[in-house]
Amino acid sequence: MSRRALLALLPGLIAGCGGGRLLRPRTAASNPTLLENARPGTSDWELTGPAVDREIEGYASATSVDRGAGIDLYVSTAEPAYTVDVFRMGWYGGAGARRVAGPIERPGRAQPMPAPDPVTGLMECRWAEPHHLRTADGDGPWPSGVYLARLTARASGRQAYVVFVVRDDTRRAALLFQSSVTTFAAYNNWGGRSLYAFNSAGAPARAVSFDRPYAMNPYGVPLDGAGDFLRRFEYNALRWLEREGYDVAYATDVDTHRRSDLLPRHRAFLSVGHDEYWTWEMRDHVEAARDRGVHLAFLGANASFWQIRLEPDASGAADRTIVGYKDGAAADPLAADPARARRVTAHWRDGPTARPEAAMIGVMYVADPVDADVVVDDASHWAFAGTGLARGGVLPGLLGYEVDAIASASPPGLARLAHSPFALASGESGYADMTLYQAPSGALVFATGSMYWNWGLDDYNAPGLRSARASVAAQRITHNVLDRMLEGAGGA
């Protein structure tokens, strides 16, 4: 479809935005996200025969690339041939994706399982003969977004994904959506080792690699190579943002780590869902952006809980290895070096780091597993405009799985929007908080205090993996916050 044809469709698309949000046509016509979602989508992107015993699997040479650049897909299958289809994930009228390439025919090759490093437990693949994929076609470079390459073994029909992000390093989109790939990798137990004991064979690893396929997410749900993107929170938020016509560009937290100039190119930064693992550089860059007036929206919980370091892989490729000693931080090589002890891979709020995440976010992690309701506290706040909610009103089922609360390190002037009680199976109980504050720069910082908030935005995965929890009120609140950020009205 030509750009002219797409522009002709815009009035209908604008009128059909699901949350009642109006986009000025003169603005919409230059909104690449809206134009992209006017293109024909497909529902053929989902797996019809997911791999069950590693019949086919793969990983990408980078977590993200700039649009038009190349990326290598490393694939292992014992079958003689496989195909690759590539999809950009979005709304597309509810179809959920657009096919941008494929099917591409490839010869199969069984790749070796690496041995774990005897000291750190690192599992790093060094596979051969990748498929080189250029993120461009006859229409030009692909638009920024989250992409899934679907691998299909020809003989058996077994399938798996490889996930990667396409950036747009030249465009100043209103919103920057960060995919939290370091958290995907921390929980990934492919080969038998993750940063966690619960899904590791023996002790948890002290280092994990992006140079391997994704095996499972934190909750044991098979992800078929897509990391934590599809089955938990990020895809729900992405679908809603693109459905509602927001101007969005995409990056990963590795990009946030690398580039101090990334966030200031955008009006607001979105941390979505489960964003648990942060480097010192990530924290510096996000706080510096806030202090320059970039708004922050934390649509999740448990963000910036553990500090990690990024190191090269065995080939020298930068930022492919995540170091995280966590509860074993005393064994971290930096622990004995006073000059570098602040970078020890432990909790941000404790020890030599002593940089509580609540000072940035407004709240910080307090409990899991939680499955409860969000309870309104200050219903007079502008964030609740148009919701019809009063104090004590509830947003059913949107509090969980991990939740955050106000802490002593929270900034002064913090507005408590919701104060939600919860009870754990252990008998413990407490409260989680939704908050908003305004930094001295004028930047607004919003935190939902709940991972489940994204299920209020979009019902993908319901009822297959969870109950339906889409909430008109949650969508209106999110609109109110994002629109206030983008309009520059300010005021917490």
Residue ranges of model-derived segments:
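N-terminal export signals
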Residues: 5-22
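N-terminal pre-domain segments of enzymes
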Residues: 25-55
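Contiguous beta-strand segments within globular domains
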Residues: 55, 59-79
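Aromatic-Pro/Gly-enriched surface loop or interdomain linker
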Residues: 80-82, 86-90, 97-105, 156-262
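Extended acidic/polar, glycine-enriched regions
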Residues: 82, 123-171
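Catalytic cores of eukaryotic secretory-pathway lumenal/extracellular enzymes that build
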Residues: 89-92, 97-132, 150-153, 176-177, ...
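Helical hinge/lid and interdomain linker segments adjacent to catalytic or ligand-binding clefts
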Residues: 112-143, 226-312, 472, 491
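Glycine-rich, aromatic-lined ligand/substrate-binding cores of catalytic
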Residues: 320-455, 459, 474
